[in-house]
């Protein structure tokens, strides 16, 4: 200001100057304004804010003298003036030189479409930024709108003392560096003064605003905000684990946990008194505590060790483990065991959802969760649900709701959809009945697992997470052991006067008893005697003799030679209908078959004996033939004989009987007299009578001694023993609907 006042008193009038001199004077006035020191002593300093022309000249003059004194002590070289950078709140990064600070909305409207860039100065003029800054401050003062809080004060000296503008707080105030060599950073004392004076109140104001916003929200909005915060936390943890962990191998699957460690997930080691985590829980392993709380499961690395073992297993071994898990779940002995298995599976899935772990679609827990809701409903259906849920006899509305939670939703028509899908998508906490809430948890977890496995099969190169499919936030609200607590609590709190209802509850919670009075079998079917391979001939003969003495009728005596030839092969073309059915049920195993002994009957009633020759005919002929055989036995009173395969062809015996077309051990009876002689098979052996019908005498036919037959060829691997074949584990997809009819 002193320079301009001196120029106005001593300089000639503008009318006496030429046009060139007037332009130069005008440029000098805009560029060298507020510079009271000579050019050679001038140094870069903080620009002062324009004050009123009538009262601030003296104070600025004294301030300039202090600045000149400080410059003379430092002896800093003269450098071209630059546009200062405007630091942010964190004082770590300044704005670029060509971006001025933003203006308030009212100032932008006042300036028009150009905004804050209406005056940028001249590139060749030093201090051009000061003119634009002063103009912006005047615009901000006229708008009476406070700007961003980090433009709170301007520091006009090197000591960082704030300069106030006549008590007017609406002026635009900015912070500029005190040294030209440190653009983008401020003096430490200035930073401390700034944060201590303006950041505290602003932070308090911000917290007050947030508190008011939270008070204005309803329950749904608060719940959505909580979900968003949890999602942000999981994303931050995943980024931290990805940055700190090792990169996975190129050959490892996308769901591999190589980059996830207990340290990156912030998990504590599991307690030492727990049972060792293993993928194959067996009873012979060292015992330990298996009751774990919610915090022990969710915030330790116990489940992480189990999941890592699943990833390390080879695919065949993992599939066998899946089958073992399926049979353990589907054969749960009581309701207590099934609830423990369900909570184990749901807690395992909750662990993945909480820590944002990628899911292995071939996990044993993920393979079995799909059928748990139907299994749980089957166990609960043994109870008196009408009395427990509706307090009445028979099913009511609550029972129907429980069944609709379990059933598969279907589309009724193209325009009308079944409301079962909407019911199953409801959040579990919206159900008031404890059993409904427990079933809703199981149903929601099952739907999430099925959707994830379907998506994983479609998109193989992308890891899948549970939070992508948890639409009703069932995994977020589930706590470990919630299903058992809800159902067992409902059964414990139920009170009624119905004794049968109480008995059903007791039987459902206790292990089932093995109650069987007898084990029936069909004497017309063919039994597989390979299970009695260790039985000797003498023992079998003794049992047959004892049975014959008790019956007082016909008895059967198998011989040593008959048991020696049990392994003979038969022609598949000569199999009967009963034989083919039995072969299909036992994987076409050509095991030796023998007709079962008839049950005990009174002596007055004749016994019916069936041979394999009779089984080859149709049902009508079988019935007629059996009746004729009974009558023939009554009339003639002949013996019941066996036929062996070790005897070569020979002339038939006087007693002709119906012979089988097979070379196995058969039960024979005489042919009826009125039916004529049956067709004889020339390559069969004679009939050997064992004992007469009346038991007074027995006739023994001479049998030609022949060398033993050659040993049968070894069976092919596909025709192994039926018991061994049944022990082989099928694939998982085939096992779910496994039956004997599908063995072909």
From Swiss-Prot:
**Role played:** Immediate early (EI) protein that plays many roles during productive infection including regulation of host cell cycle progression, regulation of viral gene expression or nuclear export of intronless viral RNAs. Acts as a transcriptional transactivator via interaction with the cellular transcription elongation factor SUPT6H. In addition, acts as a post-transcriptional transactivator that mediates the nuclear export of unspliced mRNAs via interaction with DDX39B, a component of the cellular mRNA export machinery.
The organism named in the record is: Human cytomegalovirus (strain AD169)
What's the protein called, per UniProt? mRNA export factor ICP27 homolog
> Does the keyword field hold Cell inner membrane?
no
Q: Where is the composition biased (Pro residues)?
A: 706-717
Biased composition (Acidic residues) is annotated at 613-625
Q: Which family does it belong to?
A: Belongs to the HHV-1 ICP27 protein family.
Q: Which Pfam families does the UniProt record give?
A: Herpes_UL69
Q: What is the lineage of its organism?
A: Viruses, Duplodnaviria, Heunggongvirae, Peploviricota, Herviviricetes
Chief localization: virion
Give coiled-coil spans as residue ranges. none
List compositional bias (Basic and acidic residues) regions by residue number: 1-11, 153-171
List the CHC2-type zinc finger ranges. Answer: 387-501
């Amino acid at each position: 200001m002193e320079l301009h006042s001196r120029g106005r008193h001593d300089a000639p009038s503008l009318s006496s100057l030429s046009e060139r001199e007037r332009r130069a004077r005008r440029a000098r006035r805009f560029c060298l304004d507020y510079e009271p020191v000579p050019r050679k002593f001038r140094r870069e300093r903080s620009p002062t804010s324009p004050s009123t022309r009538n009262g601030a000249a003296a104070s600025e003059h004294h301030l300039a003298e202090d600045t000149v004194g400080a410059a003379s002590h430092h002896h800093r070289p003269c450098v071209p003036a630059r546009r200062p950078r405007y630091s942010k709140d964190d004082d770590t990064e300044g704005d670029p030189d060509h971006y001025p600070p933003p203006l308030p909305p009212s100032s932008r409207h006042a300036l028009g479409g150009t905004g804050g860039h209406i005056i940028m100065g001249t590139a060749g003029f030093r201090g051009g930024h000061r003119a634009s800054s002063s103009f912006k401050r005047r615009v901000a003062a006229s708008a009476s709108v406070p700007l961003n809080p980090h433009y709170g004060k301007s520091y006009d000296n090197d000591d960082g003392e704030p300069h106030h503008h006549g008590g007017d707080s609406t002026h635009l105030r900015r912070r500029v560096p005190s040294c030209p060599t440190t653009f983008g950073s401020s003096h430490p004392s200035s930073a401390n003064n700034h944060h201590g004076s303006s950041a505290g109140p602003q932070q308090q104001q911000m917290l007050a605003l947030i508190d008011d916003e939270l008070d204005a929200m309803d329950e749904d909005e608060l719940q959505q905000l909580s979900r968003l915060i949890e999602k942000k936390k999981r994303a931050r943890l995943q980024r931290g684990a990805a940055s700190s962990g090792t990169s996975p191998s190129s050959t490892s699957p996308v769901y591999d946990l190589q980059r996830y460690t207990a340290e990156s997930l912030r998990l504590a080691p599991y307690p030492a008194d727990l049972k060792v985590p293993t993928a194959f829980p067996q009873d012979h392993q060292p015992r330990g505590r298996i009751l774990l709380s919610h915090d022990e499961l969710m915030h330790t690395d116990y489940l992480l060790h189990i999941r890592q073992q699943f990833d390390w297993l080879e695919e065949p071994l993992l599939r066998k483990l899946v089958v073992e898990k399926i049979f353990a779940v589907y054969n749960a002995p009581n309701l207590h065991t099934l609830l423990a298995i369900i909570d184990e599976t749901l807690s395992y899935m909750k662990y993945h959802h909480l820590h944002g772990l990628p899911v292995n679609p071939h996990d044993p827990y993920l393979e079995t969760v799909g059928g748990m809701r139907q299994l749980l409903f089957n166990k609960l259906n043994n109870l008196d649900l009408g009395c427990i849920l509706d307090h009445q006899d028979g099913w009511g509305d609550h029972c129907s709701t429980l069944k609709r939670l379990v059933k598969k939703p279907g589309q009724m028509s193209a325009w009308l959809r079944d409301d079962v899908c909407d019911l199953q998508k409801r959040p579990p906490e919206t159900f008031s009945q404890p059993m409904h809430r427990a079933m809703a948890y199981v149903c929601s977890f099952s739907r999430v697992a099925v959707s994830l496995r379907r998506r994983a099969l479609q998109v193989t190169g992308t890891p899948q997470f549970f939070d992508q499919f948890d639409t009703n936030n069932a995994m977020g609200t589930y706590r470990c052991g919630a299903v058992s607590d809800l159902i067992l609590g409902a059964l414990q709190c139920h009170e009624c006067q119905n004794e049968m209802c109480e008995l059903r509850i007791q039987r459902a919670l206790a292990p089932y008893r093995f109650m069987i009075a007898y084990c029936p079998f069909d004497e017309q079917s063919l039994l597989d005697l390979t299970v009695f391979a260790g039985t000797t001939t003498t023992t079998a003969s003794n049992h047959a003799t004892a049975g014959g003495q008790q019956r007082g009728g016909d008895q059967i005596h198998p011989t040593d030679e008959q048991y020696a030839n049990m392994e003979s092969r038969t022609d598949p073309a000569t199999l009967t209908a009963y034989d083919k059915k039995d072969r299909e049920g036992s994987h076409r195993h050509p095991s030796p078959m023998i007709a079962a002994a008839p049950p005990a009957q009174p002596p007055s009633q004749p016994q019916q004996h069936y041979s394999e020759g009779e089984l080859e005919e149709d049902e009508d002929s079988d019935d007629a033939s059996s009746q004729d055989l009974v009558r023939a036995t009554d009339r003639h009173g002949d013996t019941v004989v066996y036929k062996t395969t070790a005897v070569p062809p020979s002339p038939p015996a006087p007693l002709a009987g119906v012979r089988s077309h097979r070379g196995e051990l058969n039960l024979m009876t005489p042919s009826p007299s009125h039916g004529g002689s049956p067709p004889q098979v020339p390559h069969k052996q004679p009939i050997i009578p064992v004992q007469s019908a009346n038991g007074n005498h027995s006739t023994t036919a001479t049998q030609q001694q022949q060398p033993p037959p050659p040993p049968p060829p070894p069976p092919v691997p596909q025709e192994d023993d039926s018991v061994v074949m049944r022990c082989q584990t099928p694939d998982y997809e085939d096992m779910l609907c496994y039956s004997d009819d599908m063995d072909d």
